[in-house]
């Protein structure tokens, strides 16, 4: 069955660990921008090989505004547990710093782009993808908002010429692209309790869909 990454929204590290233990997934994206306390990071060590550390900037869906240098300090703080992945935005002043940090500690890089208002044209998306490829990340993530069902096609077409790509549309009209992404991406994102992004499936919903499609272990 395709891999699923459960999105962890928590106020404390203890709460995050509890959610990881309660909900079975292949990977877990820890949204550091939602944390109110950074104490006891070491509690995540037993799960670090399944952890995606994300400090999302507010312009791309982050929970709160965090200055770029402060975001970099948070990435450096979580580098102590050597997570499987760091997720950093293409359009970020610290993108190269995070890529270098990941290289030093042996973590992989997810280079991401999010547009919460629309889906740009295929040509624009391809240009963004080309810029991301130049930075040689391990995985590229492109997420847009579907205003129309046809927006799914613009995003899905990106798979024609790219490997290690995660691309889908948010919103009710973008759900079909999430299913496509689950089938053709290294992994796809699901919620484990409350949905973080519009149109996001839960772990149970996505597993059921994949079973119906014959994608079983």
Swiss-Prot record:
UniProt pathway annotation: Metabolic intermediate biosynthesis; chorismate biosynthesis; chorismate from D-erythrose 4-phosphate and phosphoenolpyruvate: step 3/7
Domain of life: Archaea
InterPro entries: 3-dehydroquinate_DH_AS, Aldolase_TIM, DHquinase_I, Type-I_3-dehydroquinase
Similarity comment: Belongs to the type-I 3-dehydroquinase family.
Name the UniProt record assigns to this protein: 3-dehydroquinate dehydratase
Alphabetized UniProt keyword annotations: Amino-acid biosynthesis, Aromatic amino acid biosynthesis, Lyase, Schiff base
EC number(s) recorded for this UniProt protein: 4.2.1.10
Pfam families per UniProt: DHquinase_I
Enzyme class: lyase
Catalytic residues (UniProt): 114, 141
Quaternary structure, from the entry: Homodimer.
Molecular functions (GO terms): 3-dehydroquinate dehydratase activity
Residues annotated for 3-dehydroquinate binding in this entry: 29-31, 56, 178, 200
GO biological process, one term: amino acid biosynthetic process
Catalysed conversion reaction: 3-dehydroquinate = 3-dehydroshikimate + H2O
Role this protein plays: Involved in the third step of the chorismate pathway, which leads to the biosynthesis of aromatic amino acids. Catalyzes the cis-dehydration of 3-dehydroquinate (DHQ) and introduces the first double bond of the aromatic ring to yield 3-dehydroshikimate.
Cystine residue pairs: none
NCBIfam families xref list: aroD (TIGR01093), PRK02412.2-2 (NF002683)
UniProt signal peptide: none
SUPFAM superfamilies for the chain: Aldolase
């Amino acid at each position: 069955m395709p891999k699923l990454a459960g999105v962890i929204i928590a106020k404390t590290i203890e709460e995050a660990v509890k959610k990881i233990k309660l909900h079975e997934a292949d990977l877990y994206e820890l949204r550091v921008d939602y944390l109110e306390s950074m104490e006891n990071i070491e509690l995540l060590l037993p799960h670090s090989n399944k952890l995606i550390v994300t400090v999302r900037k507010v312009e791309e869906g982050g929970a709160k505004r965090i200055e770029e240098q402060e975001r970099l300090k948070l990435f450096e703080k979580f580098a102590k547990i050597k997570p499987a992945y760091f997720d950093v935005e293409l359009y970020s002043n610290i993108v190269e710093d995070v890529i270098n940090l990941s290289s030093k500690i042996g973590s992989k890089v997810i280079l991401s782009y999010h547009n919460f208002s629309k889906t740009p044209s295929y040509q624009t998306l391809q240009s963004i993808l080309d810029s991301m490829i130049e930075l040689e990340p391990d995985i590229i993530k492109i997420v847009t908002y579907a205003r129309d069902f046809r927006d799914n096609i613009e995003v899905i077409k990106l798979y024609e010429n790219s490997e290690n790509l995660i691309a889908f549309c948010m919103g009710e009209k973008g759900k079909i692209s999430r299913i496509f992404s689950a089938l053709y991406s290294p992994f796809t994102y699901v919620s484990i309790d409350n949905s973080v992004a519009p149109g996001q499936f839960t772990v149970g919903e996505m597993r059921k869909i994949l079973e119906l499609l014959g994608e079983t272990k």
